[in-house]
Regions:
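Alpha-helical membrane segments and immediately flanking helix-loop junctions
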Residues: 68-100, 126-129, 136-151, 164, ...
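Membrane-interface loop-to-helix entry segments
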Residues: 35, 43-59, 165, 173, ...
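Selective recognition of specific alpha-helical transmembrane segments in multi-pass small-molecule
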Residues: 115-123, 203-218, 229-249, 282-285, ...
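Extracellular/periplasmic helix-exit of transmembrane alpha-helices
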Residues: 123-135, 241-257, 270-271, 301-304, ...
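N-terminal alpha-helical transmembrane segments of multi-pass membrane transport
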Residues: 1-88, 98-105, 116, 440-462
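N-terminal amphipathic/hydrophobic targeting modules at extreme N-termini
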Residues: 464-480, 561, 567-568, 573-576
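Helix-loop-helix module between adjacent transmembrane segments
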Residues: 39-44, 82, 115-140, 149-186, ...
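Flexible loop linkers connecting adjacent transmembrane helices
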Residues: 49-74, 96, 102-106, 118-160, ...
């Protein structure tokens, strides 16, 4: 009964919704494909081709260090999100795409990545902006559930304990990650059975035991990934690159096959052109997670002074995942003769291709690599899950541990299930997550896009920062609602245009301030006593070193909603609330 429900929801999300007849070609598109392509095109145009225009900024953002000691660094957030992207998506996801969609699916995975990079930028920027303190694990937490909650509060005009849309996203995420847990154990057990003739039950139980040792501890998750992901991704990339370089004469033929099947010039699968497009986009989403709302959970955990930087980091992760690593996997399989991989699916297909290229070592190499990739994926999705568990149940170690135990149980179940069944649950979960995530991305995207517009000046300013004497610590003051009410909202030392300002409501007056600095200061930075436009409301802010000395230290932000403030100047008058 449960399997029938899962399959029914799967057909609703990923089944044919729109059929287009283009000459001799029939294109059938699902609801999810239409949703993702529309969002990708919209955000790519709105960000003015962000993957190309700001590629240098993406690399610079990854290299920044976290000197504050709390939260994750930019590199760590990239590692966590890459752990889940590179883990299952680049091996199992690509294999699934080629098994059903043929070589043309690779092209549509590339399209999904190029369009999805802008979507990932928007959702990760919003996640960083609306993050909250993590009282259980320390640092920060956030994600779509949290900015969906903020959006609901704005529409209702009052504080809410829970938002229906946010709860639905959180539940969808937990369902999705249970499904991915099954895919993890199913793929690893199949690979080890082919490589070492180990029964699936034995592999599954050993994998579950090793996972339990790590995930049931409090702080081992990210530290484990810091070491595991760069090493395993590097080894896999070098090995596949060597295979590609030794088959360079065949590479043009592979590209011809990819593009001809992708554009419907050659039919290679039973479902025709529509199957190629749908499976390429579906597995592209599973691989790079753009738009699904998974990666923002990692982006929110970063200690970052500018949400735009974290958006750029996650956009780069999408490109690394699909354009680089996924392509390596696809080329390895497509460079093998069709007679080697004909009739195979799942990990059998990839292992057969690797055996052709590397002999028996190739089968063992893929089995071990997949085990490490899958292990990192499982750790990464539990890192995502804890943000959503916290939103649903609050700061509770009991519920955090309960979900970890459930995920471990799903590992065991997945090792015993059929290949298609375990994929359906993951696809249902990721589809529902994407729908609820989009409910917030469109209304809130203006904030991320406004900040994105000032990214270039900020980067140039930061390059010159070392040549300017450091200014004393200062605070931004904002006038809200009442003409003479001033609230300390953020530390203003080296505060650039595009930075996000947020402050708890004043205890006596009940007002809150939040917004994005639109302009101000020399080279985009706020100068002392200079009015600054804040957000769309036109609230003016002013830096006052005198108030900073009285306040003593910056107040903490918590992502409160925008106040109904009217444009007013805070210059001259009032004292800051402390």
């Amino acid at each position: 009964m449960l399997i029938q429900i899962i399959e029914g929801v799967y057909r609703l999300l990923w089944g044919d919704l729109l059929t287009l007849h283009l000459g001799n070609v029939t294109l059938s598109l699902s609801f999810m494909v239409i949703l993702l392509l529309t969002a990708g095109v919209f955000f790519t145009l709105r960000t003015r081709l962000l993957p190309v225009r700001l590629f240098r900024d993406m690399l610079a953002a990854v290299c920044e260090k976290n000197d504050k000691g709390s939260g994750l660094s930019s590199f760590q957030t990239l590692v966590v999100s890459t752990a889940t992207r590179v883990g299952m998506g680049n091996l199992v996801g690509v294999v699934a795409a080629l098994s059903v969609g043929g070589a043309g699916a690779v092209f549509w995975m590339w399209v999904t990545a190029l369009l999805g990079a802008s979507t990932s930028f928007v959702e990760s920027t919003l996640a960083q902006k609306y993050k909250q303190p993590d009282h259980l694990y320390g640092g920060w937490r956030g994600g779509p559930a949290y900015y969906l909650h903020t959006l609901a509060e704005r529409k209702r005009g009052r504080k809410l304990r829970r938002s229906v849309a946010a709860c639905l996203f959180a539940v969808s995420g937990l369902i999705c990650w249970c499904g991915i847990s099954q895919v993890v154990s199913n793929s690893v057990s199949e690979a080890f059975q082919n490589a070492f003739s180990i029964p699936p039950l034995v592999t599954t139980l050993v994998l579950t035991a090793l996972a339990a040792v790590i995930v049931l501890r409090k702080e081992a998750t990210v530290k484990s990934l810091d070491v595991m992901v760069p090493i395993m991704a590097g080894c896999y990339f070098v090995m596949t690159l060597w295979i590609i370089l030794t088959h360079l004469p065949q590479l043009p033929g592979v590209f011809v096959q990819i593009f001809s099947e992708a554009l419907g010039l050659r039919q290679a699968v039973g479902g025709g052109f529509g199957a190629v497009v749908m499976n390429g986009i579906k597995r592209g989403l599973f691989s790079n997670e753009a738009g699904s709302g998974s990666a923002p959970c990692a982006a929110a955990a970063a200690e970052c002074d500018d949400p735009v930087k974290m958006g750029l980091v996650q956009a780069l992760g999408v490109l690394i995942d699909t354009i680089v690593i996924c392509s390596c996997t696809a080329f390895v399989m497509l460079l093998a003769p069709g007679s080697v991989t004909s009739g195979l699916q799942g990990m059998n297909l990839l292992q057969a291709a690797m055996q052709y290229h590397l002999g028996s070592f190739g089968v063992v190499f893929i089995a071990v690599t997949l085990a490490l990739f899958s292990f990192s994926t499982f750790i990464g999705i539990l890192y995502y899950a804890r943000c959503n568990v916290a939103y649903l149940f609050g700061d509770s170690w009991f519920w955090q541990t309960a979900y970890k135990v459930l995920a471990l149980v799903m590992l065991v179940v997945g090792g015993m299930q059929a290949y298609t069944v375990v994929w359906d649950l993951g696809d249902v979960g990721i589809g529902l997550m994407t729908i609820f995530n989009m409910l917030a991305l469109y209304p809130l995207s203006g904030e991320a896009l406004t900040a994105c517009g000032s990214t270039k000046p900020k980067r140039n300013s930061s390059e010159q920062k070392s040549h300017r004497p450091r200014q004393p610590m200062a605070f931004v003051l904002c006038a809200v609602t009442q003409p003479h009410l001033e609230v300390v909202v953020a530390e203003a030392d080296q505060l650039p245009a595009g930075a996000v300002l947020s402050q708890r409501p004043d205890g006596r007056q009940g007002h809150s301030v939040e917004g994005v600095v639109l302009a101000g200061g020399v080279d985009g930075h706020i100068a002392e006593d200079e009015p600054v436009a804040l957000g769309r409301r036109g609230v003016e802010a002013v830096v006052s070193h005198d108030i900073a000395r009285e306040a003593g230290r910056p107040a903490e932000a918590d992502g409160a909603g925008l106040s109904p403030g009217s444009p007013a100047s805070s210059r001259g008058g009032g004292r800051a609330s402390q």
